[in-house]
Amino acid sequence: ALVIARAFVEAAIARKAAKLRAEAVVMDAIAAAGDSPILELPMGMPFRAAIDRAGADHLLFVVHPRDTDWAITGIRRDPEGFALRADLPEAWAGLTDAAFAAASGVPGARFCHNGRFIAVAADRPAALQLAALAVQDAETVQQAR
């Protein structure tokens, strides 16, 4: 029983340590982003708590590498709901590959979810370009309100 209890405690400590390391990486990335509404992370990791803790309300999208491509993710307004600070452009919703690349004007654009909360690009330059276009679109949508 002691061995099992020890394993549970060690696992909990390891999870907490990993969470703290991830939060430190996100905090450094927030500092590096400055006033940019785009947060670039070195890998996929939990980011919401660090963004809240840093008071980084200006951030709209997170860009990070995945196994073979890059993701552009919207940031939720609050931890409880699904509403985003900014949606990806409506014109991209549900598009893939050539259709997405044509609609966005970005070679390497691969996929945008119908819900407009995540898009995928072939590489970092394409992901950053899509994120910049999404910010421009979000600003236009905001001004129209």
Language model: regions and residue ranges:
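C-terminal accessory domains and tails appended to enzymatic cores
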Residues: 1-145
